[in-house]
């Protein structure tokens, strides 16, 4: 089909004669198959925002409506839609107006009407291509009297033809066999008349073959498609193919060497256009909705203020730091302009693939028609390739952009050579995690048989097939040719909702699900290794033993006074800390494995200041919360409790209170409600002035701090004193 990047004028010429509606039981009629092909083609054009203009002409209709119609000429031919941009109305016309009739019309007459429509409606417009697509089963009679004249006018006007038939045609212009097309889906199989082709259809094939050979030569038969072949090619929505814009710049190495270059985006992450708008639910019009923004003070009267009386503020902990427009402009990075400067070189082995980041990949070429630049860049590319080196580059798109640091590595192909640029992370972009070693746990040490089984499984799941004889590597799962299922699902649902307002959305199309399945060849190869792994790694249910609680545990003697008991607990913790510190060696910072013990050790031994150690602990708390897992929530709680205890002991109450207030705001922003419920249940609140002299928080304020913001604040009553053992026995 004509889905070229150039603007095209396309006429869909559809046979709706009586024979197009005939079908055998269990088969779709030719007209239904033709409607499917046209629908898929038009919906591609709609969602790709194509500038092509499309018209719709039906022949074999009960009525007549075209500019050439006379008393006995060009009858039963209807121009259903003139040339215009495709839209959902055209899709509705294809679905509703294309129905089989009781008449027939001359195919060549319909072709003349289409040619006339293109010539008249393209006057004053620029089109790269003019195209007619014919959908027919060739059952309608036709007169070949003017065939040579039609072919001559098609060539003269630069109009190309494509035919879409219910059955395939081979390279010799003969009807194909049932086995000619290998279809993976039953509903895409070619439709063959069970009693063979009629004489009229055979005559039509000869006429179509003659026309296409006259227009396109031997390649003309490639423009004759079967409905099933077209459906397979069109079953995936495609976005418009955008031509990469050149980015000219100077590649500089030191102060004295510069090379004129031009860069193109090779890979860029495709994103949805933000086209969602709010409309009135009854009229479905955007204009019926008015949006008004009002700024109010956070007081009882909600006093309204004008936008001119407001400025931006940056929230830092519990404080808001004001920033005016002047401040924002002064804060912005002032760049000298676009830049592609080499900072230095390093071995390619030092730049690991896991460091690649960003949303695009650039290919850097020498400037066009600059021989000196081409020689210089080629020398650089080959030198890097021979030495296994890469260039570390400072990249800035323009003077408004913040600079990036990236890697440029050589890329040499038979047809061209260039540098490929990928962004690298800064220090803040890296996430460091520490995990306990599996090697130190003897229970986790695999046997040789288990290691061998996993090796075999990995080998069997390889998505690369190597042909040893031809030394060719074949990709069994080419991701660059697999459409994004998110886009496909959105387009499918938008199309369905536009045409069927009241119906439920359809399920995901099966061919999309099939594309995401592992290759059949790979699944067959990994069956045996999988069964071997299942045998060598048996899964057994672990039943957690309940801790038996004795009467002594319940009614334990507690003759110690409060302060003494607290002192005993502290000494016990210190013993534990010293033992763990001996196991870990010299502790110089708070780690992620034992953050509580590390924190206590650092502040008590005065290896680090309380401020420094607390900042390290807070960093780990934030990392634990980012995982959004209950296990790490509990670990965060242990850290917070330790922070609170040590803050009281070292008179750092205000530091802990500021942290907890900032934590609550962060929890609300990230919607970590489950974690905050744990905080409330454990009663971890602000440090009051009764607990530490450095705090100004009252007990009432500390209690209100844990109360939900959306609920009315209620006065809290003090906890009742716990009863003694005798009271408990009386209750029993």
Swiss-Prot record:
One of its GO terms (cellular component) is DNA-dependent protein kinase complex. There is a cross-link at residues 195, 532, 534, 567, 569, 670, 689 (Glycyl lysine isopeptide (Lys-Gly) (interchain with G-Cter in SUMO2)). Residues 9-161 form the VWFA domain. Pfam families: Ku (PF02735), Ku_C (PF03730), Ku_N (PF03731), Ku_PK_bind (PF08785). It comes from the Eukaryota. InterPro entries: Ku70/Ku80_beta-barrel_dom, Ku80, Ku_C, Ku_C_sf, Ku_N, Ku_PK_bind, SPOC-like_C_dom_sf, vWFA_dom_sf. It is found in: Nucleus; Nucleus, Nucleolus; Chromosome. Its EC number is 3.6.4.-. The modification Phosphoserine is found at residues 258, 318, 578, 580-581. The EEXXXDDL motif is required for the interaction with catalytic subunit PRKDC and its recruitment to sites of DNA damage. The VWFA domain interacts with the KBM (Ku-binding motif) found in a number of DNA repair proteins. This is X-ray repair cross-complementing protein 5. It comes from Mus musculus (Mouse). The gene is Xrcc5.
